[in-house]
Amino acid sequence: MNRITQKLQEDKKILSIYFSAGYPNLNDTVQIIQDLEKNGVDLIEIGLPFSDPLADGPTIQASSTQALHNGMTTQILFDQLQNIRESVKIPLIIMGYFNPMLQYGVEAFCKKCAEIGIDGLIIPDLPVDVYADEYKAIFEKYGLINVFLITPQTSDERIRFIDSVSNGFIYMVSSASVTGSQSGFGNVQETYFERISNLNLKNPQIVGFGISNKETFNQATKYAKGAIIGSAFIKHLSESGSGKIQEFVGEIR
């Protein structure tokens, strides 16, 4: 069974953390992953930096740009993660844009992910229809879960289609804006969370965008299986370096 599926079956709210691979320094990636697991994080999203990130807010864009400047590439990330399963047991997801995956070769990329123990992918600019028609069989061949994003603007019909081709969780974007642009949730988000809850989807949902502290984590997980923190963690890395992860996670849990 895929590690993501196993984790989702646990009777707890999932804390997922996103960071850009190769940030703050090129070789910080593995240490950050190990420290996040050690401090009780349930799931890690490793951002593969890309030069034209559509959905990312300024904080994640800046970290991605710095990581590219540091020399991060798809191959270097794979090399860094080659032995990650010797020390890390929790689910790992690579989040990135489709272009670098296409350049590497979709099947070669999926094969490499499976070899090193990556459990899933999040590719915001890969349309679900294209995935279902052209790539689903490849992902499944290598045991990878593909996670799709939904927003308040996504129709119920589209959400049900996404649910039907998904086999892990659905990434529930809390607003239609870019990451890191909110603090807290208002009535609009609460109505949206309730709407999704009432659809009774087969896949659990994890909320992302706008989660930055204990309050927003607890608010989001009232309606969902878990929540993802990205921009706030990257800000913490930029201000405190990779040595104070315990402090950050301790304030959420």
Swiss-Prot record:
Active-site positions on this chain: E45 (proton acceptor), D56 (proton acceptor)
A family per Pfam: Trp_syntA
CDD domains, A to Z: Tryptophan_synthase_alpha
Keywords in alphabetical order: Amino-acid biosynthesis, Aromatic amino acid biosynthesis, Lyase, Tryptophan biosynthesis
Residues in coiled coil: none
Reaction(s) the record says it catalyses: (1S,2R)-1-C-(indol-3-yl)glycerol 3-phosphate + L-serine = D-glyceraldehyde 3-phosphate + L-tryptophan + H2O
InterPro entries for this protein: Aldolase_TIM, RibuloseP-bd_barrel, Trp_synthase_alpha_AS, Trp_synthase_suA
SUPFAM superfamilies per UniProt: Ribulose-phoshate binding barrel
Record's keyword annotation contains Manganese: no
UniProt family annotation: Belongs to the TrpA family.
NCBIfam families linked to this entry: trpA
HAMAP family listed in its UniProt record: Trp_synth_alpha
Name of this protein: Tryptophan synthase alpha chain
